[in-house]
């Protein structure tokens, strides 16, 4: 979860998963610290001094001071030079007074712990296939225990990647169907210890109540570079209007439909020679590329939320 979405300090379990290192009893040596706070002199010095005192070597550090908002953002990737003596909990508890001094919203993540991701789909499989392929190729370090679909169409695709599939139908004629489906989703998030929900062309609108329960933990992909063309067949509408750019946006889901903080956007230039089918194919590529980047950056703790905006440390 991005730091600003956490509402304060994350607990050791919530921020890094398994306190003390990787599974199997082996002490992990690498951690990612993310933080945001009101900007002032001395933040970088205080963070660096603490990490040095804790026996950590900085592998990568990025920071950004937003002069307009007066906010400071930082991501530090470190390795512990004494992993058997300094555990995750040690690093976490030792940083608490530093964070308190500067009023930080922060998280500490164990890089050995892969985020657990639940993917939700409808009938289009291009984004799901791309995410599961990248996962299998280890280009995307996430753990996907389950795919959920409001239609059963993609069960075979999930099975081909060795991932379980659950059909959670929604009947538009039944007013209680959608609330039941969202209740099941929340149960799965809890039962499977899900860190992130990805809407990989899931064609249902989530309720404001559900969005409020998972702030900063749901990523959606849609053709938002076609904002003038609402509803069905947006690429056919775009073709009729002669658009020159099409694309897709990956964003966090909020109660405001398709208006959550943007993580990534992918665009492609097109011209009059492209058919509606061409535009749809190009759009599908843009969707899978933007979504994969957004999920990877979230999984690598590169996204920091600040209101309706995001800071991305690539």
Predicted features by range, described:
Residues 1-3, 56-57, 61-62, 91-93:
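Short N-terminal helix-initiation segments at or just after the protein's N-terminus
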Residues 1-28:
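Intrinsically disordered, low-complexity terminal tails and inter-domain linkers enriched
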Residues 27, 53, 68-70:
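Solvent-exposed loop and beta-edge segments used for protein-protein assembly and interaction
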Residues 27-38:
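Short glycine-/aliphatic-rich beta-strand segments at the starts of folded cytosolic domains
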Residues 65-71, 75-314:
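One-carbon transfer enzymes
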Residues 40-60:
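Short amphipathic alpha-helix segments
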Residues 11, 20, 28, 64-65, ...:
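Compositionally biased, intrinsically disordered low-complexity segments enriched
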